[in-house]
C-alpha cells in the first residue's frame, strides 16, 4: 500500500513530467538548484542555475523578473526546494514547481535526452 508521503511524491513527479514535457526547449527551462555550494560542486543538473534556498528571494531577479515564468527548484530531498518555492510564491512568482530531490529531477532530464 502506498502511504500518503509516497503518493504526494508520485503526484509531484507526474506534475513535473507533464510541465517539462510542455516546455518548448530545454534551454527555455529555468531550473534552480537550491543546495549548498559544496553540494553543487559535487554535481548538479545540466543547465541548472545555483542559488541557495535562503538567498533565493534576493537573487531570483538576476535570473528572471517575469513572475509568470515557470521555475523548477530542486535540492537533495525536496525539503529546501519546498522552502524556496514558498519564498518565490510570496514574492509573486506564480509558476514555481518543486522538482524534489536531485535524483528525481535528473531521472526526468535523462529521459528527455
What annotation goes with each model-predicted range?
Residues 11-13:
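Short helix-onset patch at the extreme N-terminus, typifying the N->h transition
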Amino acid at each position: 500500500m502506498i502511504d500518503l508521503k509516497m503518493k504526494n511524491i508520485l503526484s509531484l513527479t507526474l506534475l513535473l513530467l507533464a510541465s517539462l514535457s510542455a516546455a518548448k526547449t530545454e534551454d527555455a527551462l529555468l531550473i534552480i538548484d537550491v543546495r549548498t555550494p559544496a553540494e553543487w560542486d559535487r554535481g548538479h543538473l545540466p543547465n541548472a542555475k545555483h542559488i541557495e534556498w535562503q538567498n533565493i528571494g534576493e537573487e531570483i531577479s538576476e535570473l528572471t523578473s517575469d513572475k509568470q515564468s515557470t521555475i523548477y527548484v530542486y535540492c537533495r530531498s525536496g525539503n529546501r526546494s519546498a522552502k524556496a518555492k514558498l519564498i518565490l510564491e510570496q514574492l509573486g512568482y506564480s509558476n514555481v514547481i518543486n522538482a524534489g530531490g536531485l535524483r528525481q529531477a535528473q531521472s526526468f532530464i535523462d529521459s528527455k535526452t
